[in-house]
Amino acid sequence: MAAVIVLAAGGGTRMKSTKSKLLHEVAGRPMLSWAIGAARGLNPEHLVVVVGHRREQVEAHLAEDAPDVTTAVQAEQKGTGHAVACGLEGLDELHGEVVVTYGDVPMLTGETLQRMVEVHRERRNLVTVLTAEVEDPTGYGRILRGGEAVVGIVEHKDADEAQRAVREINSGIYVFDAEALREGVSKLSNDNVQGEYYLTDVVTMAADGTVEVPGRGRVGAFRIDDVWQTEGVNDRVQLARMNAEVNRRIVTGWMRAGVTIIDPTSTWIQPDVDLANDVTLYPGVFLNGATTIGAGATVGPDVTVTDSEIREEATVTRSEVTLAVVGEGVRVGPFSNIRPGSVLDRDAKVGAFVETKNTHIGTEAAIPHMAYVGDSEVTAGSSIVAGSVLSRECAAPATVSDITSDSQDDTLNPEADQ
């Protein structure tokens, strides 16, 4: 695989956002990260992202998330053909295939791209177009076929009545023979109503013989049943629909793997979360990042867990857990905030309206309600009761209670020895 070019230069004006459209998230990941992940599935020699609108934001994201990716700049948005030409500029002579895809098509998978390339090679096509059949093709370019071959692509606004009846649509995702792509792009004209250089014109050139490569055929199609893999995101409504569909698939997968989810429509699980058998999730649960939940644990209702570990048989109710470890059999909530660096050992209890931060709470220790415990070591068996503000060590069998004034004991005052 010679190269993958990801087009990510568009304005995204319909998002009405100061943030690049490509950085809006689906299932907790920027859309561009999904696109790059799919492209990596092809193991290309070159992976190029064409940037333009809000390029500084996109380049900053790539520097952190995908520093090995090459960027090319489309300073003026003159169409998809021009964007691909910008992507090719910095590449040496290419041999093999070039895949063109988009940064705002987050559900496209690496497996689909791999199969598409295989079909392209098997049929020795000049160009292979990723297509899908949809119920309502309004607004999409239509695939015109002559038998199995693609003889053209017509945009909806230019289609006649018969062509508009065609339900097979162009996704805009292609595999090109590298030589044919370079030649076709060099021949593009912007003599059209929009004054732009269209990548679809390269497809037309390959179909009518304007562009030829010895030993290669013309234009073929690879049609997929999963229409979602061809859908882009242009506004917040489409973004919400995409998030809902990705989440539906994730949630369905976990239920089939042995997780009880009381209300799948109000439970949100990001793709890197790992759940054991017999976990129960109640409504209003959000599981984010690299969270893991052990067998028999119960989470919810109304819980957010981010990059944390909830171990076997633990229970978390109406609370938030972030960058923390909740041990086996621990009970948390309701209305508690387990902040970064908190470790709750086996059978500990953190009850209502408790906040912990950077704290180790030992086995069977209890903070039943209304307390703050930060930067502390609460050893096994200790009890911290209502109104406590603890920021130092508390050792069993101590009980800390009723701290209501500035005259609290020095053992609880972190400033006392300073």
Swiss-Prot record:
Keywords, in A-Z order: Acyltransferase, Cell shape, Cell wall biogenesis/degradation, Cytoplasm, Magnesium, Metal-binding, Multifunctional enzyme, Nucleotidyltransferase, Peptidoglycan synthesis, Repeat, Transferase
Task: Show the segment(s) annotated as Linker.
Answer: 237-257
Q: What class of enzyme is it?
A: transferase
Q: What does the note under cofactor report?
A: Binds 1 Mg(2+) ion per subunit.
Binding, Mg(2+): D104, N234
Residues that coordinate or bind acetyl-CoA:
A386
* Active site, per annotation: H369 (proton acceptor)
Pathway given for this chain reads: Nucleotide-sugar biosynthesis; UDP-N-acetyl-alpha-D-glucosamine biosynthesis; N-acetyl-alpha-D-glucosamine 1-phosphate from alpha-D-glucosamine 6-phosphate (route II): step 2/2; Nucleotide-sugar biosynthesis; UDP-N-acetyl-alpha-D-glucosamine biosynthesis; UDP-N-acetyl-alpha-D-glucosamine from N-acetyl-alpha-D-glucosamine 1-phosphate: step 1/1; Bacterial outer membrane biogenesis; LPS lipid A biosynthesis
- Pfam family of the protein (one): NTP_transf_3
Enzyme Commission number(s): 2.7.7.23, 2.3.1.157
Q: Which cofactor does it need?
A: Mg(2+)
Subcellular location, principal:
cytoplasm
- Which reaction is this enzyme known to catalyze? alpha-D-glucosamine 1-phosphate + acetyl-CoA = N-acetyl-alpha-D-glucosamine 1-phosphate + CoA + H(+); N-acetyl-alpha-D-glucosamine 1-phosphate + UTP + H(+) = UDP-N-acetyl-alpha-D-glucosamine + diphosphate
Note whether Cell wall biogenesis/degradation occurs among the keywords: yes
Question: What is one Gene Ontology biological process annotated in the Swiss-Prot or TrEMBL record?
Answer: cell wall organization
Keyword Repeat belongs to the record: yes
Listed binding positions for UDP-N-acetyl-alpha-D-glucosamine are 7-10, 21, 74, 79-80, 102-104, 141, 155, 170, 234, 339, 357, 372
Q: Where is this region: Pyrophosphorylase?
A: 1-236
Q: Where is this region: N-acetyltransferase?
A: 258-418
Q: Where in the cell is it found?
A: Cytoplasm
The UniProt entry's GO CC annotations, sorted and at most eight, read:
cytoplasm; membrane
Record's subunit section:
Homotrimer.
Function (record text)? Catalyzes the last two sequential reactions in the de novo biosynthetic pathway for UDP-N-acetylglucosamine (UDP-GlcNAc). The C-terminal domain catalyzes the transfer of acetyl group from acetyl coenzyme A to glucosamine-1-phosphate (GlcN-1-P) to produce N-acetylglucosamine-1-phosphate (GlcNAc-1-P), which is converted into UDP-GlcNAc by the transfer of uridine 5-monophosphate (from uridine 5-triphosphate), a reaction catalyzed by the N-terminal domain.
**NCBIfam families, per database record:** glmU (TIGR01173)
Name it: Bifunctional protein GlmU
* Gene expressing this chain: glmU
